[in-house]
A protein has these predicted regions:
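Transmembrane alpha-helix/helix-exit interface in multi-pass inner-membrane proteins
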Residues: 78, 121, 168-171
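Intrinsically disordered terminal tails
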Residues: 1-73, 79, 134-145, 183-202, ...
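Physicochemical signature of membrane-embedded alpha-helices that form the seven-helix bundle of GPCRs
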Residues: 30-40, 106, 110-126, 130, ...
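Peri-membrane helix termini and adjoining interfacial loops of integral membrane proteins
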Residues: 88-93, 134, 175-186
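A surface-exposed beta-alpha-beta supersecondary segment
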Residues: 52-111
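Juxtamembrane/interfacial segments around transmembrane helices
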Residues: 81-96, 160-167, 201-216
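Helix-to-loop junction signature of class
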Residues: 48-56, 131, 162-183
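Alpha-helical membrane-embedding segments
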Residues: 89-103, 177, 213-225
Length: 233
């Protein structure tokens, strides 16, 4: 009777463990969607950092510089002059770094925040890959001191926060018509006649939203409260 009772207990535990695995894998499928969303968010974040169209300056000041459009980015400024007939000759770009004195605080801080956002996003992807691997292999425990789902969610939300600060600060600078004292060799005036939001800011906004959404999905992952994940036989 004792052996039969033990065998029955073992069978029940195995069924319970199998049910737990099915539940966890089903729940993890939502996290796979979150992983896809986070991947797109990271890609858009990297693209926005490299784009130059953060601020669109429309210049019509013949006495100071040739008329045209200046695209002000985080790492360079590109000027498109209207008086050139050849498009390839109309574009002139100048690179700058964090150490250039003429850069305003918003661009300096934005450079660091965008770099931090990309690093946090990559770390978040690494954690979610580890978390999904553990779930599908059935080795993730409810009482883990460092839950990779939670870690990934926090990292993605932090990355979203960094990008959001950059977006809001640059949007404020555009709306308040703040200028930049570029070197005279750039032939760009301190302020344009018209300043508008560029496509890079829109891409960054979408990246921030996707990273926030993926982080929320990762944090929503829960374990079954009434199932023991690793029963001892």
């Amino acid at each position: 009777i004792s052996h039969a009772h033990n065998a029955l207990i073992c069978l029940q535990l195995k069924h319970t463990y199998a049910a737990a695995m099915v539940w966890l894998v089903s729940s993890a499928n939502r996290q796979v969607a979150g992983f896809a969303i986070a991947t797109i968010g990271c890609i858009l974040s990297g693209i926005s950092m490299g784009l130059v169209e953060w601020r669109m300056w429309y210049i019509n000041q013949p006495l100071l510089s040739p008329s045209g459009v200046a695209c002000v980015g985080m790492w360079r400024v590109c000027i498109y002059h209207h008086h050139y007939s050849n498009i390839s000759n109309a574009k002139v770009c100048y690179r700058y770094t964090y150490h250039d004195d003429f850069l305003p605080p918003d661009i300096r801080v934005s450079q660091h925040l965008l770099l931090a956002a990309n690093i946090l996003g990559l770390l978040g992807k690494a954690f979610i890959i580890l978390a999904l691997r553990n779930v599908y292999m059935g080795i993730l425990q409810k009482d883990d001191t460092c839950n990779p789902f939670v870690a990934s969610g926090i990292l993605n939300i932090a990355a979203s926060g960094c990008i959001s600060i950059v977006v809001l600060w640059n949007y404020y600078s555009i709306m308040s018509m703040e200028g930049i004292e570029f070197p005279s060799s750039f032939r760009v005036p301190f302020k344009p006649d018209v300043q508008e939001v560029g496509s890079a800011l829109i891409v960054a906004t979408l990246a921030a939203f996707l990273l926030l959404l993926s982080g929320t999905i990762f944090l929503s992952y829960t374990f079954p409260l009434d199932i023991q994940m690793h029963p001892e036989v």
